[in-house]
């Protein structure tokens, strides 16, 4: 059986050009006015507590 050929490993990681790695998705933040209105319809006290917590 022939000897195994050992090739030197590159020190820097192999990357494709233009590939900067993972990034956060561009997702718009929810509209807080509509959120508070929906919460008021469901549970007015919970909406009031949320408003106090979030500083609204």
From Swiss-Prot:
Pfam families: UBact. Residues 30-46 have a biased composition (Basic and acidic residues). InterPro entries: UBact. GO terms for molecular function: protein tag activity. There is a cross-link at residue 56 (Isoglutamyl lysine isopeptide (Glu-Lys) (interchain with K-? in acceptor proteins)). Residues 1-56 are annotated as: Disordered. Keywords: Isopeptide bond, Ubl conjugation pathway. Belongs to the ubiquitin-like protein UBact family. May function as a protein modifier covalently attached to lysine residues of substrate proteins. This may serve to target the modified proteins for degradation by proteasomes. This is Prokaryotic ubiquitin-like protein UBact. It comes from Acetithermum autotrophicum. The gene is ubact.
